[in-house]
């Protein structure tokens, strides 16, 4: 080493990530003294650490599960973690309960919208302590569904529309309309046009039919609610007859 390499200590350059091997050659100038064998050491200069996070579920229902996992690149590997939460993404607080691991299990016992991030501390000399970007996890109330019909009684050939109203849930829904002749079991899935948010019941034959909607929320931890049933009646077309009491008079 040409610069600074003749003293009892040496400052290793750390501007770039590289592996160095160093040895010291000691010369004892006293007459008759042996020169000890060189000692070799390895110095590893690592790139500065960086951290990213990802959540298994960012939109879920109460009681579901979401785990946020951190991925650290570079650095020395001598790491410690501090997870933080924020209601608005700007004011942060340390998470004291289970908030010091490489991953974090989001609490889902109540509906909330919370931002999360992790601070990583690298214990090696000269290493930065990176902070991840944030991820928003929304815990929704369980979904519920109701249905209504614009014309509960029509004549053959008329028209009606059954509409659904959904509250809460993640919004990632699928629909299955069902029919029953009496409002009790068995309920039969409607295969023709029966998988939308609304349903137009057939009116070609007179009769009474009950309808309901089975809603599937595809979010993690979400229940699949079933609406109450409503009755739809198709009446025969009206007909009229007349009679006269005295068909012939003076």
Predicted segments with their positions:
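Proline-enriched interdomain boundary motifs that mark the N-terminal boundary
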Residues: 47-55, 141-149, 236-244
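A short beta-strand segment in extracellular, disulfide-stabilized domains
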Residues: 64-72, 158-167
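Short, solvent-exposed loop/turn segments at the edges of extracellular beta-sandwich modules
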Residues: 27-34, 121-128, 216-223
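Solvent-exposed loop segments of extracellular immunoglobulin-like
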Residues: 72-85, 166-179, 183
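Conserved Ser/Thr-centered positions that define the repeating blades of beta-propeller domains
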Residues: 1, 23, 83-86, 117, ...
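Surface-exposed, flexible coil segments in extracellular/virion-facing regions
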Residues: 1-14, 84-108, 178-203
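Short, solvent-exposed loop/linker segments at the N-terminal edge
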Residues: 58-64, 152-158, 247-250
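Interdomain boundary/hinge segments at the C-termini of tandem beta-sandwich modules
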Residues: 41-47, 135-141, 230-236
């Amino acid at each position: 080493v040409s610069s600074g390499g003749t003293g009892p200590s040496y400052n290793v350059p750390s501007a770039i990530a590289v592996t160095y091997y160093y040895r010291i050659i000691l010369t004892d100038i006293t007459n008759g003294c042996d020169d000890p064998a060189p000692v070799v050491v390895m110095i590893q200069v690592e790139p500065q650490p960086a951290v990213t996070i990802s959540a298994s579920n960012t939109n879920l229902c109460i009681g579901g599960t979401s785990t946020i996992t951190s991925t650290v690149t570079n650095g020395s590997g001598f790491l410690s973690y501090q997870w933080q939460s924020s209601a608005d993404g700007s004011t942060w607080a340390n998470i004291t309960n289970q908030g010091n691991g490489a991953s974090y299990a989001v609490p889902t016992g109540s509906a909330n919208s919370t931002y999360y991030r992790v601070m990583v501390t690298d214990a090696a000399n000269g290493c930065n302590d990176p902070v991840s970007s944030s991820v928003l996890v929304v815990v929704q109330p369980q979904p519920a569904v109701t249905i209504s019909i614009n014309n509960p009684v029509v004549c053959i050939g008329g028209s009606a529309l059954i509409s659904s109203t959904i509250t809460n849930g993640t919004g990632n829904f699928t629909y299955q309309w069902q029919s029953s002749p009496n409002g009790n079991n068995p309920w039969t899935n409607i295969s023709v046009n029966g998988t939308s948010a609304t349903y137009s019941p057939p009116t070609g034959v007179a009769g009474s039919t009950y309808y309901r909607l089975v809603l599937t929320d595809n979010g993690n931890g979400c229940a699949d609610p079933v609406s109450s049933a409503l009755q739809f009646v198709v009446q025969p077309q009206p007909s009229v007859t007349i009679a006269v009491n005295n068909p012939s008079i003076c």
